[in-house]
Amino acid sequence: MCKGLAGLPASCLRSAKDMKHRLGFLLQKSDSCEHSSSHSKKDKVVTCQRVSQEEVKKWAESLENLIHHECGLAAFKAFLKSEYSEENIDFWISCEEYKKIKSPSKLSPKAKKIYNEFISVQATKEVNLDSCTREETSRNMLQPTITCFDEAQKKIFNLMERDSYRRFLKSRFYLDLTNPSSCGAEKQKGAKSSADCTSLVSQCA
């Protein structure tokens, strides 16, 4: 985790530059997020305007609130990237996209891609699943359906909820959003109810 410039590895410093682009949320005109029509598994660029303190506080109520908000998801993903453990949220996102597929002919190739990337023995971003869930998901690959990853996705969600989500709420990635003054928001008149994420990347900048 990035705690200060002096103790950071070079890889963290490099990844921080990417975070600044990915976390370009919070311009100055709106409290809403612009939802992109497509998602790239690699660092999706999220363009959020400003996030109200009320919304930020909701993120602490549940992981579901956090990752179903465009800006919350971006902040959580950046936090996981700083810990080199973003494979879980990437898998969750891939499962969400998979369930939106309308064409039956596209299910099988997409399912195999997700399986090979996150679940197979040689997966490039293998997620931590128990043997029973892994075997069940492997059997589902014989005839992929829209629900073939449901159990695996649920297990990974529960894992994030118990572990990384709790650490996120104690991290600067979240705490700086709950304290706008630490980001210089007090200098902006009329911005008392909104959070600025500049300091989200300050630990690595």
Swiss-Prot record:
Highest taxon in the source lineage: Eukaryota
Description of post-translational modifications: Either Cys-2 or Cys-12 or both are palmitoylated. Phosphorylated by cyclic GMP-dependent protein kinase.
Start and end residues of each RGS domain: 62-178
Residue ranges the record marks as coiled coil: none
Keyword Lipoprotein attached: yes
Example of a GO biological process term: negative regulation of signal transduction
Pfam families xref list: RGS
Record-linked InterPro entries: RGS (IPR016137), RGS_RGS4 (IPR034953), RGS_sf (IPR036305), RGS_subdom1/3 (IPR024066), RGS_subdomain_2 (IPR044926)
Name used for this protein in its record: Regulator of G-protein signaling 4
Lineage start: Eukaryota, Metazoa, Chordata, Craniata, Vertebrata
Gene: Rgs4
